[in-house]
Amino acid sequence: MIAQISDLHVRQPGELIEGKVDTFACLSACADRINALPQRPDIVIASGDLADSGSPAEYRRIRSRLDQLTMPYYVMPGNHDSRAAMREVFGNTPALPTAAGQTHLQYAIELPELRVLCLDTLDEGKEGGWLCIDRLDWLQGQLAASARPTMLFLHHPPFDCGIPGMDAIKLGNPDALAGLLAAHANVIGLACGHVHRSVFTTWAGIPACICPSPAHQIHLDTRSGTPLSWTLEPGGFLLHSVDAERLTAHVVSGPTPLATPYE
């Protein structure tokens, strides 16, 4: 089982999103919830926008909390992140197992029932994402190397979510990714972030989802021409499980009251 968290947007102490959202407190509550799950995830993947401004100090703060997870965790970049600062803080840890000399932060995780490929869609200085030829070649090589069931994690969705302001800053070259994946039937799912909402769809014939943020969410408004708005809907994370027959994803929102058995 994989716990996916995304869009943490952690800032320095005392710095709140829009003057209201303590994103570090939201991350702490999320991590506590994951540690308390009755079914222990094998790993946690933080799928981008870990920091809000990409400073080393923010990543040190994030690491101080993620290090308290009781299972291994991995980090990926989003459009708010800095590769250099992530390498500085996570580069010598299992959380960022990139190869020496590798420009982009991409890597594979081997689990007993599943292979996970984490992609780097960061396009420096832009809100939208991109997969350059080097990153696509890396993915092609990884998919050619193994026929095991494989799940892809990437920050920017390659598909529309229906919110115009977010669709304008999705992955910029989804057709290149779709064309590559068409030759690999062992890719059983895609998991994304970026949108700050839970979304489920099928893209290029593959089940795909978007993870909510543990902090603020993007307001659900599908009308064209409307500005992006944020909302204090409950934050959450996703739990992905896979067996011989299916990939299943659950949305975990919180905090919630303790479960009470039926009488």
Where are these regions (language model features)?
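Extended active-site neighborhood of metal-dependent phosphoesterases/phosphodiesterases
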Residues: 55-140, 176, 182-183, 204, ...
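Active-site-proximal beta-strand elements of phosphoester/diester hydrolases
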Residues: 1-12, 113-123, 151-153, 206-212, ...
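N-terminal active-site segment of His-dependent metallophosphoesterases
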Residues: 1-61, 104, 161
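His/acidic metal-ligating clusters that form di-metal
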Residues: 29-43, 128-209, 231, 238-239, ...
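A cross-domain feature marking catalytic cores of carbohydrate-active enzymes
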Residues: 48, 77-79, 121, 154-156, ...
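Short glycine-enriched, charge-decorated loop/helix-capping segments at active-site entrances
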Residues: 16-21, 163-170, 224-226
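Active-site environment of divalent metal-dependent phosphoester hydrolases
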Residues: 11-13, 52-57, 79-87, 124-127, ...
